[in-house]
Amino acid sequence: MMDKIIVKGGQTKLQGEVEIEGAKNAVLPLLAATLLASEGEVVLTNVPILSDVFMMNNLVNHLGTAISFDQEAKKIIAKSNSEIKTTAPYEYVSKMRASIVVMGPILARNGQARVSMPGGCSIGSRPIDLHLRGFEQMGATITQNAGYIEAKADKLKGAHIYLDFPSVGATQNLILAATLADGTTTLENAAREPEIVDLANLLNKMGANVKGAGTDTIIIKGVEKMHGANHSVVQDRIEAGTFMVAAAMTQGDVLIKDAIAEHNRPLISKLSEMGVNFIQEESGLRVVGPEKLKATSVKTLPHPGFPTDMQSQMTAAQAVAVGESVMVETVFENRFQHLKEMRRIGLEVDITRNTALIQGNSNLQGAAVKSTDLRASAALILLGLVAKGQTTVRRLSHLDRGYYKFHEKLKALGADIIRVEDEDGEG
């Protein structure tokens, strides 16, 4: 049975301090990277306890790298294997798009890889197209067969690859593949996210030679083999950002422990425009929300622009800001589904293709809503904090993919929030 979250809002001013987990978007490719080691152990610390991490652990374990996860210590030990399997089967890959990043490591080590189509997306769709074209440029032959993508190359060769779009997944997959290739690979128009830097840091500790991560040109010199290493997962900037918005919306005063302001520049800049105060302290970043937020215009872009993963949460802040706000989503299609649910709480919004015009409304009323995706579920809970009366958020399986104990952290900051079994809901 699924759970639901019940928030009683309208009065809450969040106060206190909050600890942020390791980044989900970093740890999944780090787990894929463990497949590249043919000797030793890769030890990952600061690992977030999330359903996506369990799924990736199962996949990597199935492929031949033995995984043990000590949840109390937030530590994963990945024991390398002199041989790994070539096929990533449907039951592991279908549940999680990010699992496509095992293709690069398998191909690099085995000269061939068979990976089930992730979440049933067709090859022509943009996200995976870039990965495959990159593999082809490195000398692989790609075929599609019975729901599987197959790549074959006796030995991958270094190549000069230009990405049409700075896709995070493609950048990660191609870096992973290039680590063991013959010669040097140059990736141009590469994604620049902090999670890419984190991946390169681990790979270099494992014996790879990756330079330029965090810029749009990444150069990878292939090495003979890779080994174990120790690495602490970078902090989750999206979780940190979500708590920044929560403090901003509730006239709160919240210290985000060890926050890396550098990773959240665009968000901090936009929230500052809305009247939020940020104070850098020794132990983290203090976020102080104003009496009333001011409206603002936001456009999502690849890093270092405003992150699409903060778009839903930001629309929740815009919903209670004074005046008309604009949100333009340029990174993903179809990422406004949560706005229809927010309307039930009283959001006033006009949507034209990828642009939402939001009229701020300080008179929101709690309602029953269901989350449409991971970030939307957090955004609906944030809106519930400021809406008068009771908001019930269902379908929490989305939330658990990317937030650990989200309701408990909010409760510790003073929110009136509980999570209970959903007797009559659909999960």
UniProtKB/Swiss-Prot annotation:
Its EC number is 2.5.1.7. It catalyses: phosphoenolpyruvate + UDP-N-acetyl-alpha-D-glucosamine = UDP-N-acetyl-3-O-(1-carboxyvinyl)-alpha-D-glucosamine + phosphate. One of its GO terms (cellular component) is cytoplasm. Pathway: Cell wall biogenesis; peptidoglycan biosynthesis. SUPFAM superfamilies: EPT/RTPC-like. The modification 2-(S-cysteinyl)pyruvic acid O-phosphothioketal is found at C121. The active site is at C121 (proton donor). Gene3D superfamilies: Enolpyruvate transferase domain (3.65.10.10). One of its GO terms (molecular function) is UDP-N-acetylglucosamine 1-carboxyvinyltransferase activity. It holds the Pfam family EPSP_synthase. GO terms for biological process: cell division; cell wall organization; peptidoglycan biosynthetic process; regulation of cell shape; UDP-N-acetylgalactosamine biosynthetic process. It is found in: Cytoplasm. Its main location: cytoplasm. Keywords: Cell cycle, Cell division, Cell shape, Cell wall biogenesis/degradation, Cytoplasm, Peptidoglycan synthesis, Pyruvate, Transferase. Phosphoenolpyruvate binds at K24, N25. InterPro entries: Enolpyruvate_Tfrase_dom, Enolpyruvate_Tfrase_sf, MurA_subfamily, RNA3'P_cycl/enolpyr_Trfase_a/b, UDP_GlcNAc_COvinyl_MurA. The keyword RNA-binding does not apply. It comes from the Bacteria. UDP-N-acetyl-alpha-D-glucosamine binds at R97, R126, P127, I128, D129, L130, D309, V331. It is an enzyme of class 2 (transferase). Belongs to the EPSP synthase family. MurA subfamily. Cell wall formation. Adds enolpyruvyl to UDP-N-acetylglucosamine. PANTHER family: UDP-N-ACETYLGLUCOSAMINE 1-CARBOXYVINYLTRANSFERASE. This is UDP-N-acetylglucosamine 1-carboxyvinyltransferase 1. The gene is murA1.
